[in-house]
């Protein structure tokens, strides 16, 4: 089952762990009591060794999915979780921040899954997250020893709000008998999350206050003084639980190493852009697209044409994903602690996703996106004064005529650019180095000087006739009087590999009234065959 979060393979997980050689692993499948993976090819698996999402299983894999807690109906070969015994819980645990070991989670597979506490599915404490404890850690120099413990800190989030608890949609989502089944939705999510920026939260302290507003923000002064003590989630953690697979994805710009404390970049992925001014501005997450897997996305809830899931400290909601409206895919991010108004403030901008209008594929097979930055910049228009202007004229208030680039409103889209387009420099003393990896490309919005020009540009860009022209031009058919080739009807609005990544192609759709003119079968619908009709 592609969706069910990976429970583990019996190995402790940490920042240096990159999986297990499956050819040497016990030959048992995911439905076995050990929960180990099976791969006879001998290739190295880069799957996380534990589910680092806000979803887990109360019972072991065999008890939950092997039959004792499932039912089959209508002769279907796919088991459906029995609602009366729905053994799913939110919050897989947090990492151990004690003794300076903030970059590893030392909870063993036995303790994290509760497999050592249960021989089957019977018993009230079988895999109960409230009974799962964090292991004790002893450190002597560089040597660490992990000791199983029966008592200790809980390894789950005790204060997750009800808004992300499993719902009645879970049985359908975890079966393959529903159009909006989990496997199809995961294909959608994996493609989509590879082409849009994503926010990840700070895990907080080792107590029952995980999602306070102050944990979502980082001060520039703290960045400048000590970039290592902010507990940034840029080291591969989701919900405070380290994911070794994500460590390889993240771009550790804040990690110092080598001689002279020279900052070094490791595996290119994502990182944080430190505010340029010495103020309390929020850090900006930069990403060329994340390759999230089903193991990294939690609390998937499918309801009608809406899909919601938890990613880090945010609940991401996509509306109209089954039948997206013309040129629009609704996106919404909500802080997990929805009871606190300040918690809903994103670390980017008040309404970052209001800028997203959709994506499509050009004739080169690259994803292009439409971003409306007026909503993101609107709150900054009245205070747009550069430092140079303030220094020369002493002006402290803006005229409102200019719309400078919002420091927290950078645009990122999956596309291929020259490596020279983004070359962040790192220096130490007289030493300078340039990282020119094409994975680090950063596409910034064009600087708009007049608000009316922004309005006109967006109107032109989103006008149905302009969209039609762009589509025809992209495929080199703007001057053709022939019917569109069949390939356009079947291969264009799909998810596929784009430049080495799995990108989503959300077509800026053509209204029905223009369908006959364009003769493209995109209305029925773009996601047909992936997440249902």
Swiss-Prot record:
Region (Disordered): 15-45, 92-166
Start-end of Basic and acidic residues biased regions: 95-107
Residue spans of biased composition, Low complexity class: 28-45
Paired cysteines (S-S): none
Signal peptide start and end residues: none
InterPro entries: Adhesin_P1_C
Family according to the record: Belongs to the adhesin P1 family.
Protein name in UniProt: Putative adhesin P1-like protein MPN_409
Organism: Mycoplasma pneumoniae (strain ATCC 29342 / M129 / Subtype 1) (Mycoplasmoides pneumoniae)
């Amino acid at each position: 089952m592609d969706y069910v979060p990976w429970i583990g393979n019996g190995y402790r997980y940490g920042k240096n762990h990159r999986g297990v050689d499956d050819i040497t692993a016990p030959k048992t499948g995911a439905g076995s009591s050990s929960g180990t993976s099976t791969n006879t090819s001998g290739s190295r698996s880069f799957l996380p060794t534990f589910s680092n999402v806000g979803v887990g299983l109360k019972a072991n894999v065999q008890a939950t999915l092997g039959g004792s807690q499932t039912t089959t109906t209508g002769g279907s070969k796919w088991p459906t979780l029995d609602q009366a015994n729905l053994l799913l819980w939110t919050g897989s645990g947090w990492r151990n921040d004690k003794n300076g070991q903030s970059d590893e989670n030392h909870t063993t597979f036995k303790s994290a899954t509760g497999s050592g506490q249960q021989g089957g599915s019977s018993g009230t404490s079988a895999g109960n997250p409230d009974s799962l404890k964090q292991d004790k850690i002893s450190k002597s120099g560089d040597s660490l020893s992990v000791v199983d413990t029966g008592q200790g800190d809980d390894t789950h989030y005790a204060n997750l709000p009800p808004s992300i608890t499993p719902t009645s949609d879970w049985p359908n989502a975890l079966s393959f008998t529903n159009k909006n089944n989990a496997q199809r939705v995961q294909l959608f999510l994996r493609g989509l999350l590879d082409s849009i920026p994503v926010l990840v939260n700070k895990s907080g302290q080792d107590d029952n206050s995980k999602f306070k507003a102050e944990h979502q923000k980082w001060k520039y002064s703290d960045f400048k003084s000590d970039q290592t003590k902010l507990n940034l989630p840029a080291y591969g953690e989701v919900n405070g639980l380290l994911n070794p697979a994500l460590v390889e994805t993240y771009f550790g710009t804040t990690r110092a190493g080598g001689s002279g404390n020279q900052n070094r970049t490791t595996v290119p992925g994502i990182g944080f852009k430190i505010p340029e001014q010495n103020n309390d501005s929020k850090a900006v997450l930069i990403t060329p697209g994340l390759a999230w897997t089903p193991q990294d996305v939690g609390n998937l809830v499918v309801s009608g044409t809406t899909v919601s899931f938890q990613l880090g400290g945010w609940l991401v909601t996509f509306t109209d994903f089954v039948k997206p409206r013309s040129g629009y895919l609704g996106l919404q991010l909500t802080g997990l602690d929805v009871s606190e108004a300040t918690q809903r403030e994103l670390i980017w901008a008040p309404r970052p996703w209001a800028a997203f209008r959709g994506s499509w594929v050009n004739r080169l097979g690259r994803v292009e996106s439409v971003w409306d930055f007026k909503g993101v910049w609107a709150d900054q228009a009245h205070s747009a004064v550069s430092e140079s202007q303030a220094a020369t004229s002493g002006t402290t208030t803006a005229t409102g005529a200019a719309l400078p680039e919002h420091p927290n409103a950078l645009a990122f889209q999956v596309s291929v650019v020259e490596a020279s387009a983004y070359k962040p420099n790192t220096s130490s003393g007289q030493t300078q180095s340039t990282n020119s990896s094409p994975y680090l490309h950063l596409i910034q919005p064009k600087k708009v000087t007049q608000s009316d020009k922004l309005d006109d540009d967006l109107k032109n860009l989103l006008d149905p006739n302009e969209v039609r022209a762009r589509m025809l031009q992209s495929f080199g058919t703007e001057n053709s009087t022939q019917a569109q080739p069949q390939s356009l009807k079947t291969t264009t609005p799909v998810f596929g590999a784009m430049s080495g990544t799995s990108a989503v192609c959300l077509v800026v759709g053509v209204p029905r009234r223009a369908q006959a003119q364009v003769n493209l079968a995109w209305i029925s619908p773009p996601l047909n065959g992936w997440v249902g009709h």
